[in-house]
Amino acid sequence: MPQNKGPFYMTTAIAYTSGKPHIGNTYEIVLADSIARFRRQEGYDVFFQTGTDEHGQKIELKAEEAGITPKEFVDNVSGEIKRIWDLMNTSYDKFIRTTDADHEKQVQKIFKKMYAKGDIYKGHYEGMYCTPCESFFTESQLVDGKCPDCGRPCVPAKEEAYFFKMSKYADRLIDYINTHPDFIQPESRKNEMMNNFLLPGLQDLCVSRTSFKWGIPVDFDPKHVVYVWLDALTNYITGIGYDCDGNSSDKFNKYWPADLHLIGKDIIRFHTIYWPIFLMSLDLPLPKQVFGHPWLLQGDGKMSKSKGNVIYADELVEFFGVDAVRYFVLHEMPFENDGVITWELMVERLNSDLANTLGNLVNRTISMSNKYFNGVVENKNVTEPVDEDLKSFILQVPKNVSAKMDKLRVADAITEVFSLFKRCNKYIDETMPWALAKDETKQDRLATVLYNLVEGICIGASLLKSFMPRTTERILVQLNANERTLEEMEQFGLYPSGNRVTDKPEILFARLDLKEVLEKVEKLHPKKEEPKEEPKEEVEEEKTENVIDIEAKPEITFDDFEKLQFQVGEIIACEEVKKSRKLLCSQVKIGSQVRQIVSGIKAHYSAEEMVGKKVMVVTNLKPAKLAGILSEGMILCAEDADGNLSLMVPEKEMPAGAEIC
């Protein structure tokens, strides 16, 4: 058993009970599960909490539409969410519901304590409200009159409400973020929170509602219900036994503060601004890290039922199996940029990575062991230089995986594991067991080769457990082997010499035919026929030379020109400026620096398209604020007569920071 490294408390965001979760929602619980499982492998005493967020006006309206009570509605949806989490083989320790009696009681006590402390006061709210997002906005925050977060219409709202004094703790939070560089990850999320919200100044937050009833009542003013975010965020402490009166459980004292809150990038503001400030009000330590993961997109954008592009986890499992789906969502998601899932990509990954690289390796190794030695795997120690190369490569992989997981680079970690399987496949090509089998004098060498393969697969399968736990079990059962600890993976040769593998190897992952899969998907989700356009008459256009004349600006001297500094920049992150129809906010690497630059190119490039591009930047412009966001340079573009923009990019590969002269 690995040594006990102490407690490790991690959470996901609790899922909102407005409907069945799609694969984009499910990605988070699978990601969290892989981290929790790996921390357990390392020897941590992990407590992993997830659950459901069950109050709010949106749920009240949906229950009314369904003709049932809100409690009946959330019971059904919460049960469905838990079913999906269990289907995906996630190893959570607690599934909390915000309708749990102990949670509701503590939320009332927390609200009362904040009120008694003077952090909450009664006032009136007048503004715009987005029901789906459960969020208030001022008129200036709307985009084209609609919600800046989801794009749906907002409705005027005027009501008595309680407010939390956010500004009271703002400076303290800014100082905390500056002195705890790992608190908000990835780095680009921290820059967004600081520049877009904290530095411009915080407004007081509405923390109660009177226009609906489905919520936790404020016990000293029961016509008010507690605003959903104060209710939902406190689950992270109530779920492990926090008590506002000082009678917290041993579990709370053991595990708080949380080591990791894993959440979607769209709710990072609530977790890195509202939540820490609530904790400061309660005199509780802040969580050690909040990681805002990217979205899993379905080909043409973020999944939503209104777009009709939703893929559900249980449908994917029916086609591919649990571990194949886990592998895909973990492998395909970059560290901070959105990933893409399509049926075509799923089939491609299953066939190439799972059926070929992994499945074929295991099957070939077991089959050769049975064919040549009746399943007995014996180390005859007849070695060649290629064996040492294999061993050194394999022994390095667990170290690489640990380093990646420490940084939450899960996609990179699982890629490292599969590099081990690829190296074993290469070893087969290098040693050619089929040729050794034909030479009676090479039988001990053949046995050694097969032993090395089985040993390598055992280490790889044990490393795979955090990501594909059932596949690990299936491989080790066929090899008649025990799972290795991380400490044991520091040695090569622990597989018992003379052990016997199964004589009936099973196929881990069968190859799939893309056409057949797509035909089944079509039956599951028939496409709606789009209206056909009437054929347009062809009009012969006069060809013109592709040039454009612009009005000349006044001449400048060479000395004036030399004052400007132009450099190549690499865009490492990019987000939409939600209050603007035109602006994107990019994090641009220029040499060893990372600068924030706001550009009016949203109509021409998506944030996803921008990431990874090398662009030309004016780097010595005086910083200025655009839409309240600090911009530290200018990205250069060309514009045609129709107003279309094109980024100015280097013709050849150039390093970030290269001077443009």
Regions found by a protein language model. Name each.
Residues 2-77, 96-111, 116, 133, ...:
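N-terminal catalytic cores of NTP/NDP-binding nucleotidyl/phosphoryl-transfer enzymes
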Residues 117-170, 174:
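Cys/His-rich short segments
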Residues 122, 345-382, 393-501, 618:
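Helix-rich, typically C-terminal accessory recognition domains appended to large enzymatic cores
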Residues 289-292, 476-478, 585:
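Beta-strand segments within the central parallel beta-sheet cores of soluble alpha/beta enzyme folds
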Residues 472-560:
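Intrinsic disorder at enzyme termini
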Residues 536-661:
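Phosphate-backbone binding interfaces of nucleic-acid-interacting proteins
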